[in-house]
Amino acid sequence: MKYLRFAPILIVAMGFFLSCSSINCPLNNRVMTVYKLAGDVTPLADALTISTTRTNGTDSVLLNQAVNVDSFSLPVSYNRPQDVLYFQRQNTAGWSLTDTVVIEKQDFPHFESIDCNPSYFHVIKRVSHTRLGIDSIVINKENVNYDAKEAHLLVYFKNFYQ
């Protein structure tokens, strides 16, 4: 009878331990595309601003006036078959060039656990772009997932200072 007073504490403690899950969600659960500058223009001395248009029609700046960059990461949409990005390059003299980059991709839902947030992985199918300030863009790694160690796209900017 004297042990019955510990029953509520024991029930709460058992409930606490039984509610814990052995599945851990990944800490790095953001799917980002890694861009690496290649060629003669690394790092890029000009200010680089990258924006996109959201599904509701408003603009969103993804990278704001980055200077002396040689790589950067950008988020990937999960509800559109292609991402349209606007690369604006501006130097200290004031001239500005804007290139449009279209990344065609295929989205795949990725399931870890019921406890984890949903995520999408992607396969880059094709990249097209205007050629005002960008010379070329090469697909280096087509699978976009949690692993952001290797560059997915290599960007070759034109050199205007030669």
Feature-to-residue mapping (PLM):
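Alpha-helical transmembrane segments
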Residues: I11-M14
